Regions:
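Mid-chain, structured segments of secreted extracytoplasmic proteins
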Residues: 56-102
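Bacterial Sec-dependent N-terminal signal peptides
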Residues: 1-20
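Acidic, glycine-rich flexible loop segments
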Residues: 94-120
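Short, low-complexity, Pro/Ser/Thr/Gly-rich segments in the mature regions of secreted, periplasmic
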Residues: 140-152
Length: 152
């Protein structure tokens, strides 16, 4: 109970200024229809992260496309600022994968955004059947490849 109260007090402004922030604010999917997780500090520092904000909800194809569009807009807006960064081994600042396992479809997208000072930022989403999870991350993780290793 105390942890729930603490998590509820965490600020939600880390992803402010991004188009996807509309989702985290409950303007696209009502907050009561989402499972939201906010983690900050020591609990995730061993993963080289300082901020983790995720929302999970049921999403049809149209909603997935709408959210993907917002995330891509954020990525494109930041891609100019990424020229100083080292791309992954394939030369990309984003990654995607589509899998089918046990009759379930799984689609994942990961995007590197321009850093805020020395803090690196990432936007990721995963769709498993009709459930979508969107995650905003901040920390010292240096690349998408390193981030993928953390989430293995």
């Amino acid at each position: 109970m105390v942890l729930c109260c603490f998590v509820a007090l965490l600020p939600c402004s880390a992803q402010s200024g991004l188009h996807i922030n509309q989702l985290f604010e409950g303007k696209i999917v009502p907050k009561r229809q989402m499972v939201e997780t906010l983690i900050r500090g020591k609990a995730i520092s061993k993963y080289k992260l300082s901020y983790f904000h995720s929302v999970r909800f049921k999403a049809d194809e149209a909603l997935v496309k709408k959210i993907d569009h917002l995330i891509v807009r954020d990525f494109v807006n930041d891609s100019e600022k990424l020229k100083d960064r080292q791309p992954d081994s394939r030369g990309f600042y984003h990654s995607d994968s589509m899998k089918k396992a046990r009759g379930r479809k799984l689609f994942t997208q990961m995007y590197e955004l321009a850093p805020h000072g020395s803090t690196n930022r990432y936007l990721c989403y995963k769709v498993v059947d009709d459930v979508m999870t969107v995650i905003y991350l901040e920390g010292t993780v240096s690349s998408l490849e390193e981030l993928k290793e953390i989430f293995k």
